[in-house]
């Protein structure tokens, strides 16, 4: 008899099991939804790509020189000719020359008499004869240098191609053999009406057998001058500076500065000196009989400018640009420095490194001529628009409204926002300034939204209620306008404080290449000198927003600010900070970041609001109405001979500029600073709070230790009266001349006929038959 089978019947699932499985199911669904959100919102977001630009690599043809019975440059072949210039080359040496038909001057890429140099040793002699130097890493991350003469031309490892209005040299540097590291680099010359365009398109660079080019120095001795020449080099040091030829400062370091400052992701955390960045992508060489303006047209964000004098490496005074093609980063493997390895970016930055050498005629002499030519070019390109004349210059002042401070509730610490200046009090400041005779005023309102001065990321706009809310903000704007001024609201897009709990630092922050960690910065710790400190306040530390997500934040802000009745937007960082993102899966170079930034400046301009930039770089000029914290001096470098208002000579009459905060100028220096404002043609600029500045002593803004409006009102009005007394006659006028005279006297000339003499000495001085009082100025032609 067969045994019967019993069927087991499952009982009902226990309540506990059902709850656990339900929780797990919800968790899986939530996790899946979040992953979808994460990938859509962060990984696949690519709006920044809409702003990226590209370039084309021109196909080469057979090089054919232009026949010429009597060459203007002996032993050279004619390549191209324009209305003003002739382009020549010497195929045996790859030297290029530009002959100026207007004055008969010839400018060479390399000195023809290099062998006669009295200073250059073997390596420097090689450099004198080279069109560029390249710096590279090998497969073991050991760096080296190659120069075109010894590593290419001398070996006859180069060829020539014809291109439109020019010539392309193809250099093969190194040992061209199996398994030997070598490089192929194109160098292009194109002639235009009054300038030569020189470029190295990185798409044409080839690297063989584990060689990695990380920097190229281009045409180190183009237009270089000798001991016999008189003149100077113009460099974009702060406001601008000059280095006199043969100035004898042979122990001083050469001038070398990154354009738009070094990429924060390539900079050292340790800050040993604080320098004003180079805001202009240009330099110049000014001789008695000719002047050459050099502008970096493409790749400026990855470039630096170097200048030096004769008697150090060779007999020449020189200036040249260098371009960074990639960086190497430290990767710490096991927690201590002994395990550090160099990680090299695999691909060079895709950029058409382009430099324009403009040969100026007698109309554009000296550094004033360089500035005038460049300004006229920007006007012609639609990047600068002439301002209308006004009765007075504007008075600039920042108003700190909301500030974060630590508070406690039931033993828990948190940040809350308190008012240093609410919107009604800011109205009172504007009214009192107007009553003091300051009708033309520009208010920069800081800390008005999203939690105060160190506000949360700007994808939302929450106007702080305790300050007065939206209605109070618009009433404040109405008051400033009625007083004859403009009000700008301040916003930081790229520097996001660590106090913002809603920002996804891991996904949206810019990252380093080596270890891949998020870049974080802060203030300088006076003990360690590292620039990553909060000095006790988390708000002082910040992450840098990746350029990938900049369009999202700017777009959302632009949509919201357009609905608020304020005159302008003050950009705390967008016009002056340029950062890459070295995230390995989606790397964005500084040059690509520049494309994105320009696109966002256009978006903000389209809101119809005026734009203010903070010490704006030259790429922001086309969008900027006003500039605060404009450079009014150069960095005190030993090789520098004098500071000049190069920045202001380009912008004055087209963009209104203001100085840095005058609250923090030493009282003994204030008289000289006031004269400095008059010389450079910039307005005074203060920072105010209605409450006493001591209220901020236990906040992240304790460095603003003297801002109380009631203490500064009379002093500010007096300073404004002094500066306005001179500059009100040149509002809307272009600065066309600047002369450094004897005995600490400066002469500034404007295109409306006004001339201002400034005397920095403590005795009255004579200039052009006029007497200028001690520590004062004199107006002529008003």
Place the predicted regions along the sequence by residue.
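An active-site-proximal structural segment forming one wall of the substrate-binding cleft
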Residues: 371-381, 422-425, 429-432, 545-569
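N-terminal Lys/Arg-rich, disordered targeting/topogenic segments
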Residues: 1-16
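N-terminal accessory beta-strand-rich subdomains and adjacent acidic, glycine-rich linkers
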Residues: 36-387, 769
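Solvent-exposed loop/turn segments at secondary-structure junctions
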Residues: 95, 104, 176, 204-206, ...
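Aromatic-lined carbohydrate-binding/catalytic grooves of carbohydrate-active enzymes
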Residues: 390-478, 482-549, 576-580
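Active-site-proximal substrate-binding groove within the catalytic cores of carbohydrate-active enzymes
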Residues: 87, 92-101, 287-319, 496, ...
């Amino acid at each position: 008899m067969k045994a019967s089978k019993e069927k087991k019947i499952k009982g009902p699932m226990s309540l506990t099991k059902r709850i656990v499985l339900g929780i797990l199911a919800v968790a899986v669904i939530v996790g899946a939804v979040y992953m979808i959100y994460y990938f859509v919102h962060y990984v696949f977001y690519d709006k920044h790509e809409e702003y990226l630009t590209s370039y084309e690599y021109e196909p080469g043809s057979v090089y054919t020189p232009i026949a010429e019975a009597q060459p203007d440059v002996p032993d050279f072949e004619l390549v191209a000719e324009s209305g003003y210039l002739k382009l020549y080359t010497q195929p045996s040496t790859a030297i290029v020359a530009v002959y100026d038909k207007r004055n008969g001057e010839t400018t060479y890429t390399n000195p023809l008499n290099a062998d006669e140099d009295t200073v250059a040793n073997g390596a420097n002699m090689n450099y004198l004869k080279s069109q560029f130097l390249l710096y590279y890493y090998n497969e073991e991350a050991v760096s080296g240098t190659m120069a075109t003469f010894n590593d290419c031309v001398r070996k006859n490892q180069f060829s020539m191609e014809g291109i439109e209005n020019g010539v392309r040299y193809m250099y093969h540097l190194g040992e061209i053999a199996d398994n030997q590291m070598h490089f192929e680099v194109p160098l292009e010359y194109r002639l235009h009406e009054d300038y030569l365009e020189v470029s190295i398109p990185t798409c044409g660079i080839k690297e063989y057998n584990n060689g990695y080019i990380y920097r190229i120095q281009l045409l180190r001795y183009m237009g270089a001058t000798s001991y016999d020449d008189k003149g100077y080099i113009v460099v974009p040091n702060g406001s601008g500076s000059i280095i006199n030829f043969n100035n004898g400062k042979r122990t001083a370091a050469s001038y070398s500065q990154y354009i738009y400052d070094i990429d924060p992701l390539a900079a050292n955390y340790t800050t040993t000196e604080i320098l004003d960045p180079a805001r202009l992508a240009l330099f110049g060489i000014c001789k008695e009989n000719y002047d050459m303006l050099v502008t970096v047209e493409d790749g400026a964000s990855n470039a630096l400018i170097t200048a030096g004098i004769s008697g150090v490496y060779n007999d020449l005074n020189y200036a040249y640009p260098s371009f960074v093609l990639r960086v190497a980063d430290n990767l710490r493997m096991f927690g201590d420095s002994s395990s550090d390895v160099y990680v090299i970016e695999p691909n060079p930055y895709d950029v058409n490194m382009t430099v324009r050498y403009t040969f100026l005629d007698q109309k554009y002499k000296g550094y004033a001529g360089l500035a005038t030519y460049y300004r006229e070019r920007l006007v012609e390109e639609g990047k600068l628009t002439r301002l209308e004349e006004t009765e007075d210059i504007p008075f600039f002042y920042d108003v700190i409204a909301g500030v974060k401070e630590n508070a406690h509730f039931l033993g828990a610490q948190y940040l809350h926002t308190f008012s240093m200046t609410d919107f009604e009090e800011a109205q009172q400041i504007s009214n009192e300034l107007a009553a003091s005779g300051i009708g033309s005023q520009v208010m920069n309102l800081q800390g008005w939204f999203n939690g105060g001065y160190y506000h949360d990321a700007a994808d939302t706009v929450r106007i702080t209620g305790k300050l007065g809310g939206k209605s109070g903000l618009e009433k404040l704007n109405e008051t400033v306008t009625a007083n004859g001024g403009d009000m700008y609201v301040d916003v930081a897009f790229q520097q996001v404080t660590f106090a913002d709990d809603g920002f996804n630092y891991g996904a949206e922050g810019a990252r380093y290449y080596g270890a891949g960690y998020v870049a974080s910065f802060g203030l300088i710790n006076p003990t360690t000198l590292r620039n990553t400190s909060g000095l006790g306040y988390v708000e002082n530390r910040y992450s840098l927003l990746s350029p990938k997500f900049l369009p999202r934040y700017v777009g959302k802000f632009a949509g919201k600010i357009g609905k608020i009745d304020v005159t302008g937007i003050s950009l705390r960082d967008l016009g002056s900070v340029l950062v890459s993102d070295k995230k390995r899966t989606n790397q964005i170079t500084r040059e690509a970041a520049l494309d994105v930034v320009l696109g966002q400046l256009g978006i903000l301009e389209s809101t119809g609001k005026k734009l203010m930039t903070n010490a704006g770089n030259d790429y922001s000029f086309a969008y900027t109405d006003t500039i605060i914290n404009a450079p009014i001096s150069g960095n005190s470098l030993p090789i520098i001979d004098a500071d000049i208002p190069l920045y202001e000579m380009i912008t004055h009459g087209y963009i209104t500029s203001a100085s840095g905060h005058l609250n923090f100028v030493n009282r003994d220096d204030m008289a000289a600073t006031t004269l400095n404002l008059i010389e450079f043609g910039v307005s005074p600029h203060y920072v105010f709070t209605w409450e006493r500045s001591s209220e901020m002593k236990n906040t992240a803004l304790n460095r603003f230790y003297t801002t109380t409006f009631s203490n500064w009102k009379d002093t500010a009005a007096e300073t404004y009266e002094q500066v306005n007394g001179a500059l009100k006659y040149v509002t809307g006028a272009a600065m066309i001349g600047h002369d450094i005279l004897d005995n600490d006297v400066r002469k500034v000339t404007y295109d409306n006929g006004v001339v201002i003499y400034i005397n920095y000495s403590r005795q009255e001085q004579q200039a052009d038959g006029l007497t200028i009082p001690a520590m004062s100025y004199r107006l002529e032609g008003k």
